[in-house]
């Protein structure tokens, strides 16, 4: 499957909100993807746009995802839906990302079929479970506390080191508070793929920020 090959080579994963308060999602996504983002995921929970306009309704979310889908396909990248298997199916998403408390994997698979499915993990037991279950990739963290997930303890780089020591062939991404300044520490801990949020979404030049991160990841191999 072409999408699986794209996942195998993916190193830079971006989570973004819908940027409703700025109204620049299409331009932002295009710049970030041109800069080297491999996977772009919509996650609007807790965003400035949600605080101002309220939660995205399903119809609105599908419209936002259409913008991301268009940009991702023009740049040969993958686009992901957070949590909602029904939205992933309706939007024809490449990827569904599940948290620990989201829909059970078996149910999600019945809805999205053989689409790429990922899983969040926050301790070594969850990492081991993700290695063994029918997910295509998993995320490990948070490496540092982050406002995206307020109140969630950060297991830190020790969990990244422990995950790297497992030597799994399944793709996995470090996540949580990662930016260009902290990325060398994450790479030293053994990760070769990362998820970022504010490192690109809050950048004055999202394309340049993505390009810098992608270059560092590429150099690390």
UniProtKB/Swiss-Prot annotation:
> Does the keyword field hold Magnesium?
yes
Q: What CDD domains has UniProt attached to this entry?
A: TMP_TenI
Q: Which superkingdom heads the taxonomic lineage of this protein's source?
A: Bacteria
| Binding-site list for 4-amino-2-methyl-5-(diphosphooxymethyl)pyrimidine | 41-45, 82, 120, 149
State its cofactor. Mg(2+)
Task: Provide the binding site for Mg(2+).
Answer: 83, 102
Annotated pathway, please?
Answer: Cofactor biosynthesis; thiamine diphosphate biosynthesis; thiamine phosphate from 4-amino-2-methyl-5-diphosphomethylpyrimidine and 4-methyl-5-(2-phosphoethyl)-thiazole: step 1/1
Write the record's keywords in alphabetical order, separated by commas.
Answer: Magnesium, Metal-binding, Thiamine biosynthesis, Transferase
Reactions performed catalytically = 2-[(2R,5Z)-2-carboxy-4-methylthiazol-5(2H)-ylidene]ethyl phosphate + 4-amino-2-methyl-5-(diphosphooxymethyl)pyrimidine + 2 H(+) = thiamine phosphate + CO2 + diphosphate; 2-(2-carboxy-4-methylthiazol-5-yl)ethyl phosphate + 4-amino-2-methyl-5-(diphosphooxymethyl)pyrimidine + 2 H(+) = thiamine phosphate + CO2 + diphosphate; 4-methyl-5-(2-phosphooxyethyl)-thiazole + 4-amino-2-methyl-5-(diphosphooxymethyl)pyrimidine + H(+) = thiamine phosphate + diphosphate
What are the record's GO terms for cellular component?
A: cytoplasm
Could you give the cofactor binding note from the entry? Binds 1 Mg(2+) ion per subunit.
Which HAMAP family does the UniProt record give? TMP_synthase
Q: What is the role of the protein in this entry?
A: Condenses 4-methyl-5-(beta-hydroxyethyl)thiazole monophosphate (THZ-P) and 2-methyl-4-amino-5-hydroxymethyl pyrimidine pyrophosphate (HMP-PP) to form thiamine monophosphate (TMP).
State what protein this is by name.
Thiamine-phosphate synthase
Q: Which organism is it from?
A: Mycolicibacterium vanbaalenii (strain DSM 7251 / JCM 13017 / BCRC 16820 / KCTC 9966 / NRRL B-24157 / PYR-1) (Mycobacterium vanbaalenii)
């Amino acid at each position: 499957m072409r999408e699986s090959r794209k996942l195998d080579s993916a190193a830079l994963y971006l989570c973004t909100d819908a940027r409703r308060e700025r109204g620049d999602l299409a331009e932002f996504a295009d710049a970030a993807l041109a800069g080297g983002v491999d996977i772009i995921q919509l996650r609007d929970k807790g965003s400035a746009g949600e605080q101002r306009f309220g939660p995205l309704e399903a119809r609105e979310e599908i419209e936002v995802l259409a913008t991301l889908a268009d940009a991702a396909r023009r740049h040969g990248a993958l686009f992901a839906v957070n949590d909602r298997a029904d939205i992933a199916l309706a939007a024809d998403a490449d990827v569904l990302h599940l948290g620990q408390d989201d829909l059970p994997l078996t149910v999600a698979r019945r809805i999205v079929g053989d689409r790429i499915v990922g899983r969040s993990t926050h301790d070594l037991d969850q990492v081991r479970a993700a290695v063994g279950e029918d997910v295509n990739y998993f995320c490990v963290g948070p490496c540092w506390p982050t406002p995206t997930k307020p109140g969630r303890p950060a297991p830190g780089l020790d969990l990244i080191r422990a995950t790297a020591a497992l030597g799994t062939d399944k793709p996995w991404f470090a996540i949580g508070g990662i930016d260009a300044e902290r990325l060398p520490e994450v790479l030293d801990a053994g990760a070769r793929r990362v998820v970022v949020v504010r490192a690109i979404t809050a950048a004055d030049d999202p394309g340049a920020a993505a390009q810098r991160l992608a270059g560092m990841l590429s150099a690390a191999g």
